[in-house]
């Protein structure tokens, strides 16, 4: 049986959202796969499902299907593409509870948080359903009276998307919605830890009327082989990837020979700064929202918390008191706010970062250890006495650990915050308006949260600078990377 009782106790076995196959050219198929791979619940270690282990051959077939379907999809009036996307959005909202149950089962985040992700993911489809009708060109004043100069924008073509496990719904729709809206077709490779959510989204896309070949899903564990095919196949004209900076570099190199368009949303290591004129209670709430959402497994979560010296102890005490009250456990249990780490590798990294900090002089205010028993759980943690030489200062922890650094001056903390190869997101809490402007302009990051710990929205451009990536997702700018600009010069008029 492809699906086990560990999954069907949360999602009915008869649910149309459960498919044990990839989706190529409008057909649910195992392709030529001779092996399967397992999908596990990280909260319990239980087997949820076994899926076909697809590879380069199936990816090539999906690319061929997308390439054949792309001209017809692009030729459809924007209003038609918009209507289909809107129907997909409606189906996601109508099936939000079932989608959230699938997501919680395979990824582990608490069910209310998973449901929030589903609605957030759907919002990108709704947004780009509207933006599909607003892909405008422009006219240019000609240098002579017998010419007319026009710029039009056309879809780039076939797009390959590679998405991570930490937001298995939102990372997919944030890429696919703008691509489909402007007339591109897509081959999607979800993370092998969380393929069931992607499959469920494809089921609803099919129900919404997205034609065969327009949206394809490849499931499998051989990410390098699938990635090489997507990057090396000349029919694919764009790659969009969310994941580690290390893998992003590899994909960028593989795309270089064909000068393929690339969008990359990579690592973070976000600073979270608390100045002495901040509202400390609000800063604590913002830190919790930013740091502990999804058990700290987000690329934009606060990774380094800098607190000005004269409020350091007060902030640390307030934060530790709140964090100590957090309930950790299976995401399906009521009241749980911190779920598991995605796997043993993720848990081991968190343990290593905490051990390294303690060995170098840091202190634990609360938490600091894994939770014994089934699942990959780590207690929500607050560390004080943290210094630059520790791993928590240089690497993304990707776990529920808040290391508190002490600083004295604005200049000092700006230098520390910018002392990283990354530049995705940063946060700070302050009261003085002049300071707010100066700090926001000085921080070398693509997104800045000011007096808030949450800033992601389908209406805003998401993306980083430095080695945190290229391009933007969301907002009216999010469609740009899926379009080519074409200049038309008409003479003799």
Language model segments and positions:
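A short hydrophobic/small-residue beta-strand
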Residues: 185-187, 364, 447
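Conserved C-terminal structural/oligomerization subdomain of aldehyde/semialdehyde dehydrogenase
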Residues: 44-50, 236, 273, 327-331, ...
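ALDH superfamily catalytic-core signature
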Residues: 246-387, 450, 492
């Amino acid at each position: 049986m492809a699906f086990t009782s560990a999954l069907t106790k949360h999602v009915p076995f008869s649910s149309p959202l459960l498919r044990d196959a990839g989706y190529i050219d409008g057909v649910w198929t195992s392709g030529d796969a001779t092996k399967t791979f397992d999908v596990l619940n990280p909260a319990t270690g239980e087997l949820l499902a076994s899926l076909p282990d697809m590879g380069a051959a199936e990816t090539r077939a999906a690319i061929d299907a997308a390439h054949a379907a792309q001209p017809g999809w692009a030729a459809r009036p924007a209003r038609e593409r918009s209507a289909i996307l809107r129907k997909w959005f409606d189906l996601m909202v109508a099936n939000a509870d079932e989608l959230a149950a699938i997501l919680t089962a395979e990824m582990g985040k608490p069910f209310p948080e998973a449901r929030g992700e589903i609605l957030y993911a759907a919002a990108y489809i709704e947004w780009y359903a509207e933006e599909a009708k607003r892909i405008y060109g422009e006219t240019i004043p000609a240098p002579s009276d017998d010419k007319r100069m026009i710029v039009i924008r056309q879809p780039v073509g076939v797009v390959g998307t590679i998405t991570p496990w930490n937001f298995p719904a939102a990372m997919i729709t944030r890429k696919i919605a703008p691509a489909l809206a402007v007339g591109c077709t897509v081959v999607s490779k979800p993370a092998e830890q969380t393929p069931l959510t992607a499959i469920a989204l494809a089921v609803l896309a099919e129900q919404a009327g997205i034609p065969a070949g327009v949206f394809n899903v490849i499931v499998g564990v051989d990410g390098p082989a699938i990635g090489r095919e997507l990057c090396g196949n000349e029919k694919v004209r764009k790659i969009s990837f969310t994941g580690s900076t290390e893998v992003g570099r590899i994909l960028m190199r593989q795309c270089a020979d064909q000068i393929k368009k690339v969008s990359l949303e990579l690592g973070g290591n976000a600073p979270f700064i608390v100045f002495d004129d901040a509202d400390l209670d609000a800063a604590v709430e913002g830190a919790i929202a930013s740091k502990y959402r999804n058990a700290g497994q987000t690329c934009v979560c606060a990774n380094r918390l800098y607190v000005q010296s004269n409020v350091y102890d007060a902030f640390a005490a307030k934060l530790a008191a709140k964090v100590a009250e957090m309930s950790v456990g299976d995401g399906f249990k009521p009241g749980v706010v911190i779920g598991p780490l995605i796997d043993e590798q993720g848990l081991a990294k968190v343990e290593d970062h905490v051990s390294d900090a303690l060995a170098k002089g840091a202190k634990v205010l609360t938490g600091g250890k894994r939770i014994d028993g089934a699942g990959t759980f780590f207690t929500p943690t607050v560390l004080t006495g943290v210094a630059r030489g520790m791993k928590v200062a240089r690497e993304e922890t990707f776990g529920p650990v808040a290391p508190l650094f002490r600083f004295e001056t604005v200049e000092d903390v700006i230098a520390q915050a910018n002392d990283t190869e990354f530049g995705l997101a940063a946060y700070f809490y302050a009261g003085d308006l002049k300071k707010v402007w100066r700090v926001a302009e000085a921080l070398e990051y693509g997104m800045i949260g000011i007096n808030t710990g949450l800033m992601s929205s389908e209406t805003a451009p998401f993306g980083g600078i430095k080695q945190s990536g290229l391009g933007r997702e969301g907002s009216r700018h999010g469609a740009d990377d899926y379009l080519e600009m074409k200049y038309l010069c008409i003479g003799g008029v």
